[in-house]
Structure formats: C-alpha cells, structure tokens
C-alpha cells in the first residue's frame, strides 16, 4: 500500500520532467530575425512605429516557425511607451520574420493604412533604433 502511494506521488514528477523536455524541444534558436513594433491606444489618435530592427539570437517555435515569446517583445515596447514617453496602456503588436524583405513588406503595408491617402486622422510617430531597441528573449526553458 505504501509503495502504491509512493508511486502515485512520483508519477506527476515524471510527467513534469517529460513536459519540461518537450518544452525545450518546442523552440529553436536562429542567429537573427527582423522585427518592428506598432503601438496604439483606443483612447487617442497617436500611432507609433519602431524601425525595422535586427535582433540576434532569437527563438522560433518548432511547429510553425513563429517568434517564440512574442508577448515579451510586445511588453518591451509597451514598457518603453509607459516609462520613457509616459503613455500608459498602449496596445503593442510585433511583426517579425527571419527575412528582412518580408518584414519590410509588412511594414509598408501597415504604414499605408495609417499614412496613406485613405488614412484617417492619425498622428503617426516614429521610434528610432537609437531610442528603443528590442532585446532577445531566452525561450530555451519555455
């Protein structure tokens, strides 16, 4: 009876160890990726775009090749807006790819929506790489 209880208690630890191993294998590291950020609020017409930046040692998801930890990069931009520009509660979007050409194409497409002829009255501002830089997020354990 005591052995059965001991085995039942050890089973979750074994499952957790296996899940941790699988999580490590979910992501893989690439030398670099390209990304830009977009920050907006529903309370005003201010729109912010970062430059297209190269970020070294980026992790991608193994299944689809998406940026792993994308929310962490969005929080980097959100924290910058809150702390440096004193603009709280910004909704931030990160667009990324391992190919610079793909990111630049998406950048131009988004810019057309907010700066083009059909754009509404938005106050579009740019955040240069000298003011804000994305930092790689270690996703090896997640």
What is each model feature region?
Residues 74, 78, 100, 104-111:
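Extracytoplasmic/secreted envelope proteins and their assembly/folding machinery
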